[in-house]
Amino acid sequence: MNKIRKTFQYGKHEVTFETGEMARQATGAVVVRMGDTVLLVSVVAKKEAEEGRDFFPLTINYQEKTYAAGKIPGGYFKREGRPTEKETLTSRLIDRPLRPLFPKGFTNEVQVIATVLSVDSKVPTDIPAILGASAAIGLSGIPFNGSLGAARVGYRGGEYLLNPSLDELKDSALDLVVAGTRDAVLMVESEAQELPESVMLGAVLHGHQAMQVAIQAIAEFIQEAGGAKWEWEPPTVNTALEKWVVEKSEAPLKKAYQIQEKTARQAQIQAIRDQLLADRAAEREGEENAVNEHELAVIFHELERRIVREQILTGQPRIDGRDSKTVRPITVKVGVLPRSHGSALFTRGETQALVVTTLGTERDAQSIDDLDGDRQEEFIFHYNFPPFCVGEVGFMSGPKRREIGHGRLAKRAVVPVVPTLDKFPYVIRVVSEILESNGSSSMASVCGSSLALMDAGVPTKAPVAGIAMGLIKENDKYAVLSDILGDEDHLGDMDFKVAGTSNGVTALQMDIKIEGITKEIMEQALDQAKEGRLHILSIMNKVLDKPRSQVSDLAPQYVTMKINPEKIRDVIGKGGVVIREITEATNCAIDISDDGTIKIAAHTTEEGEAAKRRIEELTAEVELGKVYEGTVVKITDFGAFVQILPNTQGLVHISQIAQERVENVRDYLEEGQVIRVKVIEIDRQGRVRLSMKQID
């Protein structure tokens, strides 16, 4: 294969695609370079699909190699291990816009691997990873509907920033990633500082417009490489079987989709499906391959999809009887767990989240070591989705990709209102336990986490709520749905999640399965989402509208103090012996910063104050003219040395012991004796002179 190279300007970065030199046995492979960030993106697809498979087995693996940043992995094995949270999230970010571009009915196994070979701190890796995946799939010849582009958009000083660096993002009120084709936006992932809906929509459109140069470059690159397209035809529809399924199942399915309770509805649909299989087997008894269950299931699912969509587009009530704008009934409880620092139970229809906030010390912060550098995460968010929440039996293991993704979305939504460590001295962990799920569990987690944080006394800027929107679109007819059910998400054309305060949006996530989503439709979805969000906030605020005035008595009690940085060594002691003795004696955790700031975390206020007193004694400065009570530690011919502070001794000269003349110091003093002395001089070297006779 000849080496092909394509270079184009993308904002302030030069982007280069290369193929034909690396990974030549892959179905398609591209080396993409953006600044000094370099990735190898490969795609391999199996030529034959597994018979009877009713899903598309697409696997995306994004992996970071530490050598890309000139680092050696930590740990005993000194090699990369299981995927980090960032790798999992980036894999999902690549997957979401790619998946809808594969044709319906294509079930061949496809694996995309994006490997970071070199990293530039000014160029985040996710955008070149998406561009590289699009180019590699295009080169492979796999059935794929169009080139995919992606852009990151920031917002600062009223202007949009295209593909900002990590440093620029620190000052940006927005971090938004948008991906799409020439004509359609397919995916949005964002975090914002309470921005108006108009700014969010403008960012999406700005990014989509900017990515056109990348889409064009990818198309030209693929054309220049000239790879052969796969010969693939979508599976033919058995029209006779389709007609038979419609005749048998349409009427009972329409009735089933009027059952509002999820479990009962699912049971009825399963009964209809089972009866359909039994009827088909009875009619074709004795025939070879009488029942093709896979073919029957595909047709049955399409019938379900058509029934639900027609119902909504013709203005009929939704599955659970609501109109397009109504939010399901909401109940809110806070302080539901007696020994937690903060808790909330948020229920919306058949979706329920128990969210718990725990406050810890700086030592509880999560250490992150990735290509972006070492850092500490002071706000931790975990989302758990056990199988019982959907009435299923399942294997309990570590968090799956979906749980990590939903947890990150909920975290993005509340981070803008959570105080930083310098304003609130606690490390915060929020855990959302999904107890029931029928759509929008991540947004229930947002609402519950806002309540749990306030219940714990965390001084958040404002309450946050989230809502999931959906879309049903056929030709020019469409309906935007508020607070979608799981079935509406599965059978609809868009999943559009918006979270924010009453002032603006803090997180926006969008996944679109079709083309033709116009600016007007997105505007309507955002406006309708705002209406729903404010409604949810009004219900939440009736229960708890602001943070508790103080943290729970069960949380660590913080005492903060400041000392002279030169005294830090006195507090720590040789080999840490002094600070260890204080922590053991007072049962406290003590953190000391280089600037002399000391944070004492105690189980009770009394323990914290005891530790503070010990430190004050260790670091106290000797005051001229002040009287101290000290212990005689050494006697000499010319006087006595007295310890007046834990790390400070002074000399009582023989002439300062008594009013009369003293011939022998030992006639007046002995070692270990406690006496009162006055500081009469501190010389330039810090030496202290004391007097007994000058005390009034």
From Swiss-Prot:
Involved in mRNA degradation. Catalyzes the phosphorolysis of single-stranded polyribonucleotides processively in the 3'- to 5'-direction. It is found in: Cytoplasm. GO terms for molecular function: 3'-5'-RNA exonuclease activity; magnesium ion binding; polyribonucleotide nucleotidyltransferase activity; RNA binding. It catalyses: RNA(n+1) + phosphate = RNA(n) + a ribonucleoside 5'-diphosphate. The lineage of its organism: Bacteria, Pseudomonadati, Pseudomonadota, Gammaproteobacteria, Legionellales. This is Polyribonucleotide nucleotidyltransferase. Gene3D superfamilies: GHMP Kinase, N-terminal domain (3.30.230.70), K Homology domain, type 1 (3.30.1370.10), Nucleic acid-binding proteins (2.40.50.140). The gene is pnp. It comes from the Bacteria.
